[in-house]
Amino acid sequence: MSFKNFKVVEKMIFGRGSFVQLDDVLAAQRKADDDFVVFLVDDVHQGKPLEARIPVKAQDLLIWVNVDEEPSTIQIDALTEQVQAFNGKLPVSVVGLGGGSTMDVAKAVSLMLTNPGGSAMYQGWDLIKKPAVHHIGIPTISGTGAEASRTAVLCGPVRKLGLNSDYTVFDQIIMDSELIDGVETDQWFYTGMDCYIHCVESLEGTFLNEFSKAYAEKAMDLCRQVYLEDHPEKDDKLMMASFMGGMSIAYSQVGACHAVSYGLSYILGYHHGIGNCIAFDVLEEFYPEGVAEFRLMMKKHNITLPKNICKDLPDETIAKMVAVTKSMGPLWANVYGPTWEEKVTDEMLTALFRRI
């Protein structure tokens, strides 16, 4: 039996107000006067107080990243070319400041600056051959676990799939709960539920082990304190839940919800957080206790999900979603084990999507 030898984030800073230390962290990477940093920042912060706090130097490149649509291989390739055109040398660091999508963009760009070809070539598992540029993740919304994960999820020409690699993992993260204050309620809920769903999929999966179980159980406990108890330190708790949920998946795998959500997102364009919630709400047969508790959380925060979005879609559209979802072999293996292909049929998935 072969055991995973996986990489974790090398350095991390946690605490309210810790964002102020970013300049010091970057100073350690700057060795020459012309060394530059690339800041990839969610454009929701443009013109807001956070913009003035970003430690951009004269030689640096700040790019406002729009993530209204899910990150795509086309977007990553364009951003990579923009960085290459800005300066003939490599940046000493790439900083991703935003939610999971923005952090995934930063991870992907840092990889593509050192690996030839287009990013679609590397969608899959362990296809990246060269280490990335030094890269830093700073979440301004919590839940996805992108700060801890070894993937950067992109919509490509064929499917939605991540650049899964040890080189994808951030070299440094800064977790400052001040930055997630004031996130709009629906977005706060959808993104946080990504963490909760990570935990359910990990704890109910065939890949479960004590490493994953320890992280998932604690992350789930923190999610309950945030979404059911409305704890006064909920921002700090959600930030740690997100990280620990991501760590749980590192030595396990996600499951049916993420597989179905990928099909929804790729074909219908739903963002990852809400896509997961829409999918999870119909997966009682897979995760009965998790779905029941999820609905309690929705009720407490007055969340209403879209319904019947797939009921009347053309058969060919459903077939495309089924194809994307069925292609997620490792996810279904975590649900059913090595014989998953016997159970995950086109008919089963078609019936599932028609209920959404």
Swiss-Prot record:
Q: How is its activity regulated?
A: Inhibited by EDTA.
Q: Which InterPro entries match?
A: ADH_Fe/GldA (IPR001670), ADH_Fe_C (IPR056798), Alcohol_dehydrogenase_Fe (IPR039697)
Query: Can you state which reaction this protein catalyses?
Result: 3-deoxy-alpha-D-manno-oct-2-ulosonate + O2 = 3,8-dideoxy-8-oxo-alpha-D-manno-octulosonate + H2O2
What enzyme class is recorded for this protein? oxidoreductase
* Any one GO MF annotation of this record: metal ion binding
| Keywords carried by this UniProt record | Iron, Lipopolysaccharide biosynthesis, Manganese, Metal-binding, Oxidoreductase
GO BP terms, alphabetized: lipopolysaccharide biosynthetic process
Q: What happens when the gene is disrupted?
A: A double kdnA/kdnB deletion mutant shows increased sensitivity to polymyxin B and bile salts.
Q: Does the keyword Metal-binding apply?
A: yes
What cofactor(s) does the depicted protein rely on? a divalent metal cation
Q: How is the cofactor bound?
A: Shows highest activity with Mn(2+) and Fe(2+).
Which EC numbers characterise this protein's activity in its record?
A: 1.1.3.48
What pathway does the UniProt record associate with this protein?
Bacterial outer membrane biogenesis; lipopolysaccharide biosynthesis
Function recorded in the entry: Catalyzes the first step of the biosynthesis of Kdo8N (8-amino-3,8-dideoxy-D-manno-octulosonate) from Kdo (3-deoxy-D-manno-octulosonate).
**Additional info?**
Kdo8N is found in lipopolysaccharides of members of the Shewanella genus.
Similarity field? Belongs to the iron-containing alcohol dehydrogenase family.
Task: Please report the name of this protein according to its UniProt entry.
Answer: 3-deoxy-alpha-D-manno-octulosonate 8-oxidase
Source species, please? Shewanella oneidensis (strain ATCC 700550 / JCM 31522 / CIP 106686 / LMG 19005 / NCIMB 14063 / MR-1)
Q: What is the lineage of its organism?
A: Bacteria, Pseudomonadati, Pseudomonadota, Gammaproteobacteria, Alteromonadales
